Amino acid sequence: MTVDNNVLDLRKLRCPEPIMLLRKKIREIKNGTTLLILSDDPSTIREIPQYCKFMHHKLLKINTKDTIYKFWIQKTHKM
């Protein structure tokens, strides 16, 4: 896993690690910040949107057409 500013690279990780690391990263960024998440775990197609809905973050865009899934989320409240 690598983090480059507002990119969270979760490739090669499997559930539950992606959500745990996403939660940690969300705590570290400021409200209004957009985060790009990269993953190759099929469970994240379901898990990340559910996480955003539950935690009230904006899921701005999803791209699951390639083998690397991309999610753009915006932190919308303080954790």
From Swiss-Prot:
The keyword Phosphoprotein does not apply. GO terms for molecular function: sulfur carrier activity. The keyword Repeat does not apply. It is found in: Cytoplasm. It comes from the Bacteria. PANTHER family: SULFUR CARRIER PROTEIN TUSA, SULFUR CARRIER PROTEIN YEDF-RELATED. Belongs to the sulfur carrier protein TusA family. This is Sulfur carrier protein TusA. It comes from Buchnera aphidicola subsp. Baizongia pistaciae (strain Bp). The gene is tusA.
